[in-house]
Amino acid sequence: MAVTKKPDLSDPQLRAKLAKGMGHNYYGEPAWPNDIFYMFPVVIFGTFAGVIGLAVLDPAAIGEPANPFATPLEILPEWYFYPVFQLLRTVPNKLLGVLLMAAVPAGLITVPFIKIYNKFQNPFRRPVATTVFLVGTVAAIWLGIGAALPIDISLTLGLF
């Protein structure tokens, strides 16, 4: 804020220019070319310098080298695939597991069409859609946590 020139709104000439809609060319700092040729490169180079500095000063621990001849006992997917992995792991019929996975996006597609009143509707006035969303979110979190646990306690999370 200290770099830009603030307009003096008590100046009658400036007020007359502003009333005509021509004040933006006569005060302040123009965005072109000052921001494009000065501020953007400073921000970009500063970001690169910060990332490279962090990479050099605090490199991430890679861990032990991979051994292609020793497979781990249980291979876990990335965290965002945990709910789907838990479905496939606990459902006895694999075809049913695949159908359940296909039912998730199909169900999500149908949620906006349940009791539509207008496109700016309050979610508290759409109890069915809100309930489907909340139950689906809780189920996804429950399955995701269960996927990281052993199979015998994965559905109950060891709580029951």
UniProtKB/Swiss-Prot annotation:
Subcellular location: Plastid, Chloroplast thylakoid membrane
Biological process, per Gene Ontology: photosynthetic electron transport chain
Pfam short name (any one): Cytochrom_B_C
Example of a GO MF term: oxidoreductase activity
Topology in membrane: Multi-pass membrane protein
Entry keyword annotation includes GTP-binding: no
Keywords tagged on the record: Chloroplast, Electron transport, Membrane, Photosynthesis, Plastid, Thylakoid, Transmembrane, Transmembrane helix, Transport
GO CC annotations, alphabetized: chloroplast thylakoid membrane
Bilayer-crossing regions: 36-56, 96-116, 131-151
Membrane found in the keyword field: yes
InterPro entries associated with the record: Cyt_b/b6_C, Cyt_b/b6_C_sf, Cyt_b6/f_cplx_suIV, Cytochrome_b_C_euk/bac
Primary location recorded for the protein, binned into one broad class: plastid
UniProt subunit comment: The 4 large subunits of the cytochrome b6-f complex are cytochrome b6, subunit IV (17 kDa polypeptide, petD), cytochrome f and the Rieske protein, while the 4 small subunits are petG, petL, petM and petN. The complex functions as a dimer.
NCBIfam families: cytb6_f_IV
Record family assignment: Belongs to the cytochrome b family. PetD subfamily.
Protein name: Cytochrome b6-f complex subunit 4
Gene that produces this protein: petD
